[in-house]
Amino acid sequence: MKKFLLLLTCFVSFGVLAQKAAPSPAAVATQKVGNTEVMIKYAQPSVKGRLVFGTKEAKALVPYGEVWRTGANEATTIEVSNDITVQGKTLPKGIYSLFSIPGETEWTIIFNKEAKMWGAYTYKEANDVLRVKARVSEHAHTEQFTIGITAAGQVTLDWDKSSVSFYLK
């Protein structure tokens, strides 16, 4: 009887642990832009009272001027089913990691051919396929990092009080 109760307790404990939400849950943004299917896979970190974007000296979670995985956990990926233009520059069809270099007024958006990596720890600039600039605008507070795509091709990165957009065509 004691073994049975111990076993039952273990199963219940594992069940409770399995219900705990991930700190940075996985998310997917998909949209058809013209005749191209676009899918962005990313993880959604939360602000949780922290300074998100800022200087390294201010201990920002994502320091200005440094390569960021554009999400949490594994590097964010973007898949396009056909060649497409990003801010007027051609991106061949394929799967890419999506990195960014945040700045106070402008970000660099990076499409890198190494699609499978954890974070930006092994990021190599030599593998960049395309880099484009995107403007930052102030935005209502967004607790959880969110990527959206419209049918018109606007990709929006929203987190904390920042919103960054770039365009696919």
Task: Annotate each predicted stretch with a short phrase.
Residues 1-21:
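Bacterial Sec-dependent N-terminal signal peptides
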Residues 19-92, 97-169:
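Targeting-peptide/extracellular-domain and disordered-appendage signature
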